[in-house]
């Protein structure tokens, strides 16, 4: 399609063309190799920003720790992490004064959550550092391994199923002199294959017990594993992100619950809302500042950028905030909430896989694991790496680096937002006590600041005061990257505001196209994305129609399901043509079976099966929606499914789409190669969980699914449920006396076996 791109912009206002400058088409960059270098950068930078703090040594782990809190006040514009405790506490007090009861109410809400949350909350989330195996695992597996180790070491509070009880075990585990864990390992041996008579390598998986002393266990419990952040657009350099272990996660969850509850009550907070709700919140603040500045005042807005937000934040400051916020609350609650920041003050960063070396002349490759960096000869490294290693060496213990100052990415988004909002709150005239005043928006490290004043000097003074206030709380507004405009034009969290929000359509580009789940889900997701963009992102009818046609084309090429009457030859065309010829009502065939596309922009909300149902041949209906079809392994499909969309910025979003179960909703089988690796034990565990959960679901079908209340194990819940159901069935005559007696006997046997165990 040859279009002169200039033509596209003839009628477009300049501000709407902003989205064409975004780096969102094509594949995002991914990282390859190890993240060790990026992690060392993070650790070294963080220490540099706090270098004038006080050094101490952790008595338990022997880790050297740097504490910049209440350090020297900055004399230049360089980023620094010297937050002042009294300033932070005062900012909190003023925040509470402007919002009476906000902390009290949020604490009460959080206390309820703390008492009700179950351990399985921690199974959400993707990769988690598994301290028992010293590497990353899916969250559910990491949690299971942790609980298994706890129980074998006599820590059993977690059996109640409440998260708070699991956390009691975590606390107790840290006092134990030693902890015994089970690790997986691989044995390789060379054997001769009976058939081919060649030598092959045979792998066997073993489990062995290992004892960790208190120091080693504490180091693991406080470790954050690091990885490289993938798919970041518009950056030349990659950066490291952290994933904490199960000991830290539960505590962080409660702190963030409290902070989220506070953020919900703050009009300047861009979290936890998103999308249109966030835009409405934003527009309100702008409107407030514009209305108050009509005649006498001028109003300017800074599109703000902070330098290295995470690396200058400090867990000790968060501890001070929590201590203040919960000051009127019961002791147990204050203790639970203060543990996360204390653990972060003592955190260790795992350096990842280490470095790969290869010798061109000898065709050799070897991996230098992170553990060896402490004492390897540095002559093998290039200059920049050598400098990094020299700098980090004093901090190393067992391949992890002591990292007391700074927060790793994404850990306390809500709480750090509360800190940012507390500065915006200080912009009211009753606090500035002068002619200028400010307000704004904060969302994690991103902010927009609106300053009003009678003249330009006032604006400048206001910005300066804001900048210096930030410095006192360990926040560094970047003078190079922030820019100021007349109010009415600014950007905040990639929303562009120009007398109202301009749709930044380019950010949605990556989600257009075929997702690659299966034929049924992909069709549904594809049209839902187009529908959502018509609702939220100014996608006009003509463009939407074109997007739809391109999507169908893309879909047909992906699944090789071109129309039955086409000339295109693919691997499937023989079957599809045959189906086309024997179908009476060809309009009823799904696109994935070579049928025509009946979608247009008016009916995007209807699942394709429903759209075509009346047009289908009867035998086609029978084949399409037949749960007994032997060629399909069905999972039970909810009426609404969730796809994980990767928008251009921010976390992966859950997108709902309608799902109708057909023979096209297949699930690919698991790759076999995993069965030969040390992951195999984990896979078997997962299957066991799956079976247990399926069994549980049979006893508590979703229609009557209430979580068993009170403290009972899954087995106890199922046995008592079986007894109740059996009695009802017997009394209503649905089962005979013999069957009833047999069920009761089985239940008693199960209980007896449990007692003996």
Swiss-Prot record:
Residues 286-483 form the RdRp catalytic domain. InterPro entries: RNA-dir_pol_NSvirus, RNA_pol_PB1_influenza. The keyword Transferase applies. Keywords: Eukaryotic host gene expression shutoff by virus, Eukaryotic host transcription shutoff by virus, Host cytoplasm, Host gene expression shutoff by virus, Host nucleus, Host-virus interaction, Inhibition of host RNA polymerase II by virus, Nucleotide-binding, Nucleotidyltransferase, Phosphoprotein, RNA-directed RNA polymerase, Transferase, Viral RNA replication, Viral transcription. It is an enzyme of class 2 (transferase). GO terms for biological process: DNA-templated transcription; symbiont-mediated suppression of host gene expression; symbiont-mediated suppression of host mRNA transcription via inhibition of RNA polymerase II activity; viral RNA genome replication; viral transcription. Residues 249-256 are annotated as: Promoter-binding site. It is found in: Host nucleus; Host cytoplasm. One of its GO terms (molecular function) is RNA binding. Residues 55-64 have a biased composition (Polar residues). Residues 52-81 are annotated as: Disordered. The keyword Phosphoprotein applies. It comes from the Viruses. It catalyses: RNA(n) + a ribonucleoside 5'-triphosphate = RNA(n+1) + diphosphate. Phosphorylated by host PRKCA. One of its GO terms (cellular component) is host cell nucleus. A motif (Nuclear localization signal) lies at residues 187-195, 203-216. Belongs to the influenza viruses polymerase PB1 family. Influenza RNA polymerase is composed of three subunits: PB1, PB2 and PA. Interacts (via N-terminus) with PA (via C-terminus). Interacts (via C-terminus) with PB2 (via N-terminus); this interaction is essential for transcription initiation. Interacts (via C-terminus) with human PKP2 (via N-terminus); the interaction competitively inhibits the interaction between the RNA polymerase subunits PB1 and PB2. RNA-dependent RNA polymerase which is responsible for replication and transcription of virus RNA segments. The transcription of viral mRNAs occurs by a unique mechanism called cap-snatching. 5' methylated caps of cellular mRNAs are cleaved after 10-13 nucleotides by PA. In turn, these short capped RNAs are used as primers by PB1 for transcription of viral mRNAs. During virus replication, PB1 initiates RNA synthesis and copy vRNA into complementary RNA (cRNA) which in turn serves as a template for the production of more vRNAs. This is RNA-directed RNA polymerase catalytic subunit. It comes from Influenza A virus (strain A/USA:Huston/AA/1945 H1N1). The gene is PB1.
């Amino acid at each position: 399609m040859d279009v002169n791109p200039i033509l596209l912009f003839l009628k477009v206002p300049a501000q709407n063309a902003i989205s064409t400058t975004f780096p969102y088409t094509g594949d995002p960059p991914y990282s390859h190799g190890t993240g060790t270098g990026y992690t060392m950068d993070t650790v070294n930078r963080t220490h540099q920003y706090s270098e004038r703090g006080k050094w101490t040594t952790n008595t338990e782990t022997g880790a050297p720790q740097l504490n910049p809190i209440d350090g020297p006040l900055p004399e230049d514009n360089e980023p620094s992490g010297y937050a002042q405790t009294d300033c932070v506490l005062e900012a909190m007090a003023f925040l509470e004064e402007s919002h009476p009861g906000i902390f009290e109410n949020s604490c009460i809400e959080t206390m309820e959550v703390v008492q009700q949350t179950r351990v399985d909350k921690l199974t959400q989330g993707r990769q988690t550092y598994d301290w028992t195996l010293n590497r990353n695992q899916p969250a559910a597996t990491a949690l299971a391994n942790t609980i298994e180790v706890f129980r074998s070491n006599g820590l059993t509070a977690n059996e109640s199923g409440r998260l708070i009880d699991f956390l009691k075990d975590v606390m107790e585990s840290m006092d134990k002199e030693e902890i015994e864990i089970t690790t997986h390992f691989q044995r390789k041996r060379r054997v001769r294959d009976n058939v081919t008579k060649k030598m092959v390598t045979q792998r066997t998986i073993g489990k062995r017990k290992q004892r960790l002393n208190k120091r080693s266990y504490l180091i693991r419990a406080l470790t954050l594993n690091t990885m490289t952040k993938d798919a970041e657009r518009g950056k030349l350099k990659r950066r490291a992100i952290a994933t904490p272990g199960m000991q830290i996660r539960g505590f962080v969850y409660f702190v963030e619950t409290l902070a989220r509850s506070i953020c919900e009550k703050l009009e300047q907070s861009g979290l936890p809302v998103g999308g249109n709700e966030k835009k409405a919140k934003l527009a309100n603040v702008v409107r407030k500042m514009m209305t108050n500045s009509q005649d006498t005042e001028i109003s300017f807005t800074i599109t703000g950028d902070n330098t290295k937000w995470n690396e200058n934040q400090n867990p000790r400051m968060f501890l001070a905030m929590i201590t203040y916020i919960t000051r009127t609350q019961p002791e147990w609650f204050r203790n639970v909430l203060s543990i996360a920041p204390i653990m972060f003050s003592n955190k260790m960063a795992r350096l990842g896989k280490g470095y790969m070396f290869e010798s061109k002349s000898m065709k050799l490759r070897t991996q230098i694991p992170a553990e060896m960096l402490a004492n390897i000869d540095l002559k093998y490294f290039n200059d920049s790496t050598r400098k990094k290693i020299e700098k980090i060496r004093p901090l190393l213990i067992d391949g992890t680096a002591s990292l007391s100052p700074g927060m790793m990415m994404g850990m306390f988004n809500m709480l750090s937002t509360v800190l940012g909002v507390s500065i915006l709150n200080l912009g009211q005239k009753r606090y500035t006590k002068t002619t200028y005043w400010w307000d704004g928006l904060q969302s994690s490290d991103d902010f927009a600041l609106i300053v009003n004043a009678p003249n330009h000097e006032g604006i400048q003074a206001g910005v300066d005061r804001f900048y210096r206030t930030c410095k006192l709380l360990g926040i560094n507004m970047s003078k190079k990257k922030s820019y100021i405009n007349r109010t009415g034009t600014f950007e905040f969290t990639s929303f562009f505001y120009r007398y109202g929000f301009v749709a930044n359509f380019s950010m949605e580009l990556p989600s257009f196209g075929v997702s690659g789940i299966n034929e049924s889900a992909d069709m549904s997701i594809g049209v839902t994305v187009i529908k959502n963009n018509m609702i939220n992102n100014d996608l006009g009818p003509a463009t939407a129609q074109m997007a739809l046609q391109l999507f169908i084309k893309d879909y047909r090429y992906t699944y090789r399901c071109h129309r039955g009457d086409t000339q295109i030859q693919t691997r499937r065309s023989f079957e599809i043509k045959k189906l086309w010829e024997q179908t009476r009502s060809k309009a009823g065939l799904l696109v994935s079976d070579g049928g025509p596309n009946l979608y247009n922009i008016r009916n995007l909300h209807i699942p394709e099966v429903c759209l075509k149902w009346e047009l289908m041949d009867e035998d086609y209906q029978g084949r399409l929606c037949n749960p007994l079809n032997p060629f399909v392994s069905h999972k039970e499909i909810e009426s609404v499914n969730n796809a994980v969309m990767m928008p251009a910025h921010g976390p992966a979003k859950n997108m709902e789409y309608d799902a109708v179960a057909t023979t096209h909703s297949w699930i690919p089988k698991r790759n076999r190669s995993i069965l030969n690796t040390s992951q195999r034990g984990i896979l078997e565990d997962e299957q066991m969980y799956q079976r247990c959960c399926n069994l549980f679901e049979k006893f508590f079908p979703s229609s009557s699914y209430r979580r068993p209340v009170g403290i009972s194990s899954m087995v106890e819940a199922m046995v008592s449920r079986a007894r109740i159901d059996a009695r009802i069935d017997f009394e209503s005559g649905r089962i005979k006396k013999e069957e009833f007696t047999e069920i009761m006997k089985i239940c008693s046997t199960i209980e007896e076996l449990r007692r003996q165990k």
